[in-house]
Amino acid sequence: MDSMTEKQRYFSQPVERITGMDDTPERSLFRLTESGVYFREHRISAGHPGDPVEIVQITDVHFNYCDDIDLQNPELAYTKECRKWLADGASVGGIKNAMGFAKFADQIVITGDTLDYLSHGAMEMTKTYIWDVEPTAILAIGGHELTRQMQTGRPNETTLESRYADLQREWKHDVSYVSRVIRERVMVIAMDNDCGRYRPEQFEKLTADLAEARSKGYVVLLFQHEPIDTGRPEDACCPTLWECDGASYNFRHCIGSPERNDSETAKAVYRLITSSADVIRGIYCGHLHSAYYTEVIAGDTVIPQYVLEGNPYNGQVGHVMRILVE
């Protein structure tokens, strides 16, 4: 009788290294040769006894779909006419494959732009292919969830506040901030930072969660859509590990950079993050669609910051980040 579990069988398939070498695991990208899923790994040594806590990140799914309810809205009908990338739900294959990898983890986190734009059809896809598969999945939001206009050249016809409210009615957890403790060892925090913004209530919640993590010895993993400034001059032209939308990116013009006119709240959240390297062991983002590895200067140490490539690429095989806290 085959004594292998479903998880053991899944991860026994051959692995191909796409980029990187053994001595640079943070810059390595792999592919499972049978399922086709591309994956990266971040292993964190936390000195905890027992099996590793496993978190899987997916990002930038971009469900682009209008159903009959949406087509009664002239704004969405025009977006359907203009927006052709991944039209008619073409990204379903990619998320099904990525979720096939992620279902074995203790926690799934998706870091924004799950929706390509705010529509009933895209929300129904999110429920069917993500929350119905794993009801505990955490979905941080990006900018795409908050617009009904995509490549139309027109402004939204409703206020941002009303679109936040519409999204929140459909979301399974708070769209702004959510934290969860996994097996009393790892605290997962997901924050909305679309368009480079943070809000006062996020600062308050993050402050309280970091204090709890320190007192209880939790490893904190921070998930958000957009990356933050690394503080490293050389990262003004940081090369990608895997090119999709661009060969390099300026990580000195992200949230927290002195070059930006960020709000006082955004600056305060950035300072809080970069003064908390004792508990924050990784920052995980999307937004850029290509793969990057950076390190955020945090006092006399650094916090690893991984930017995961977008999920729909390479023929809808799926792209994931596997984080193991050991």
Predicted stretch roles:
Residues 71-86, 156-165, 238-260:
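Charged, glycine/proline-rich intrinsically disordered loops and linkers
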Residues 64-68, 147-150, 230-234:
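Short acidic/His/Gly/Ser-rich catalytic and metal-binding motifs that mark active-site loops
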Residues 14, 20, 25-47, 120-219, ...:
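Extended active-site neighborhood of metal-dependent phosphoesterases/phosphodiesterases
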Residues 96-108, 187, 196-297:
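His/acidic metal-ligating clusters that form di-metal
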Residues 6-123:
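N-terminal active-site segment of His-dependent metallophosphoesterases
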Residues 84-85, 112-117, 192-197, 255-259:
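The substrate-binding groove and active-site-proximal loops of carbohydrate-active enzymes
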Residues 51, 103, 135, 278, ...:
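Structured loop/turn residues at beta-strand edges in well-structured enzyme cores
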Residues 59-63, 112-114, 143-145, 193-194, ...:
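Active-site metal-binding loops of divalent metal-dependent hydrolases
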